[in-house]
A protein has these predicted regions:
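...captures the hydrophobic TM-helix bundle architecture rather than a specific catalytic motif
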Residues: 1-195
């Protein structure tokens, strides 16, 4: 169940981004939005203990194995993660719903341009990256989520790539994230070195 909450938005992102030509742009956007809304409802059910989920760490797969370093892709489940799942998925579902209406007749694109599926793919990838960030069991996975949020932010900020202001803002956000990445990596290396 928790795995669906984390990886559902990634599935929606991939389907919306890669299959919109075969299933249609409207179906892709509704599918992506539905996955996030279902995830939000499930996160509330788990949070309110209607369907109890034990505090645990669930290993999904071995991720990185190199010498003494063995990092697994795992989902941490505790009270804080349950709260953050509710926050991330609830806000994301509201953003997806709002975007359905807002993007329906966007005057920034021509009628023959496929833009909605791309936007919803980026938005759903942002949700996935944020969920990885808040449910990470180790620092490498946390960094992966951080990088995913940075990439998705860049893509969403620069979505209207025809506008020079959007391109400029996306580049600024990307550069600022790289500064944060540098500090984050130094912290990870120091923790690894001294532990």
């Amino acid at each position: 169940m928790i795995e669906f909450l984390i990886f559902g938005p990634l599935l929606g992102s991939l389907i919306s981004g890669l299959m919109y030509r075969s299933i249609g742009e409207d179906v892709a956007t509704i599918f992506t939005t539905s996955i996030v809304i279902i995830g939000a409802l499930i996160s509330w059910i788990i949070f309110l203990d209607i369907m109890p989920v034990e505090n645990d760490t669930r290993v999904i797969f071995d991720w990185i194995t190199s010498g003494a370093l063995n990092s697994q892709w795992a989902v941490k489940i505790d009270s804080l993660v349950k709260v953050m799942l509710v926050v991330v998925l609830s806000v994301s579902s509201l953003v997806h719903l709002y975007s359905l209406g807002y993007m329906r007749h966007d005057h920034n694109w021509n009628s023959n341009e496929n833009y909605k599926a791309r936007f919803f793919s980026y938005l759903s990838f942002f949700t996935f990256a944020m969920l990885v960030l808040v449910s990470a069991d180790n620092l490498l996975q946390l960094f992966f989520g951080w990088e995913g949020v940075g990439v998705a932010s860049y893509l969403l900020i620069g979505f209207y790539f025809k506008k020079p202001s959007a391109n400029s803002a996306a580049i600024k956000a990307f550069v600022v994230n790289r500064v944060g990445d540098f500090g984050f990596l130094i912290g990870i290396f120091l923790i690894y070195l001294y532990s």
